[in-house]
From Swiss-Prot:
Record-given protein name: 4-hydroxybenzoate octaprenyltransferase
Pathway: Cofactor biosynthesis; ubiquinone biosynthesis
Membrane topology: Multi-pass membrane protein
GO cellular component, one term: plasma membrane
GO molecular function, one term: 4-hydroxybenzoate polyprenyltransferase activity
Coiled coil (residue ranges): none
Organism in which the protein naturally occurs: Pseudomonas putida (strain GB-1)
Length: 296
């Protein structure tokens, strides 16, 4: 039904679907992966009772900034996507959208996101510039470093400190444990994603942690995921989170174990499924946070 609604936009404009695909609104997995840790931070920062305004601001902000990130990503990769089987039909690579149109959509999405941030406070507004900088820089990093996933992790985690400053203006040191946990988790699942394209990336000179980790890829991903859980466990103790939160962490650990087992053959399909599966890990942690506050 969601996709049918998006496709109906073509009735308004014949090229609407091209821009839906450019912003990946037809593939909401990236929204979920960004949304759950951000909302977890909103709940913790609000001590279990976040304001409706903050929930809406950060929820909509996630959707808009993820879409903006996809636009600038495809702009940066427009000359290489055509050489990768999975991305050859993207709107920019196939010529259905012009580069300046992608930049215009990126600017528009960032502008609307900034209007949302203006509804918070000055410290959160200043932090938002870091979010835009990271979102813009990430897609270009894969040309120069084997650690673009770390930059993505920094970008995908930036909503966490913003959630705390929006809730009360203060940024406790413990909030950075949540930030580090999410960064490690993001590097892990995006490495699974990069493993899908590893053979193509090697041919065209695109760098990634999947290439850097080589044969140790799955073991390093699992290590990153366990370190992420450790940071969450420590953060939970600092924020007085208890049993329900710990159950959420156990659920996430089960997800990580399944991903490790399911990718043992290193085929593209299983690596892509492992990437998608991380949505459930993030959701379980978020549910654990919400229930822990709800049943106090």
């Amino acid at each position: 039904m969601y996709l049918q609604l998006l496709k109906s936009l073509n009735r308004l404009h014949p090229r609407a679907w091209d821009f839906v695909q450019l912003s990946r609104m037809d593939r909401p997995i990236g929204i979920y992966l960004l949304l759950w840790p951000t909302l977890s931070a909103v709940w913790i920062a609000g001590n279990g009772s976040p304001t409706l305004a903050n929930v809406l601001i950060f929820g909509l902000g996630v959707v808009l900034m993820r879409a903006a990130g996809c636009c600038i990503n495809d702009f940066a990769d427009r000359k290489v996507d055509g050489h990768v089987k999975r991305t050859a039909d993207r709107p920019l690579a196939s010529g259905r959208v012009r580069p300046r149109e992608a930049l215009a959509l990126f600017a528009m999405l960032v502008g609307v996101s900034f209007l949302l941030v203006l509804c918070t406070n000055s410290r959160t507004v200043w932090l938002s510039f870091g979010a835009v900088a990271l979102a813009f820089c990430y897609p270009f990093m894969k040309r120069y470093t084997y650690y673009p996933q770390v930059v993505l992790g920094a970008a995908y985690s930036w909503g966490i400190p913003m959630a705390f400053t929006a809730a009360g203006g203060e940024l406790p040191a413990s909030a950075w444990l949540l930030y580090i946990a999410n960064l490690l988790w993001t590097v892990g699942y995006d490495t699974y994603y990069a493993m899908v394209d590893r053979d193509d990336d090697l041919k065209i000179g695109v760098k990634s942690t999947a290439i850097l980790f080589g044969d140790a890829d799955r073991n390093i991903i699992l290590t990153l995921q366990l370190l992420s859980l450790g940071c969450l466990l420590l953060a939970g103790s600092r924020f007085d989170l208890g049993g329900w939160f710990h159950l959420g962490l156990l659920g996430a650990a089960a997800c990580f174990a399944w991903e490790y087992w399911s990718t043992r053959k290193l085929d593209r399909e299983s690596c892509f499924k492992a990437f998608l599966h991380n949505h459930w890990a993030g959701l379980l942690v978020f549910i654990g946070v919400v229930l822990d506050y709800a049943f106090r």
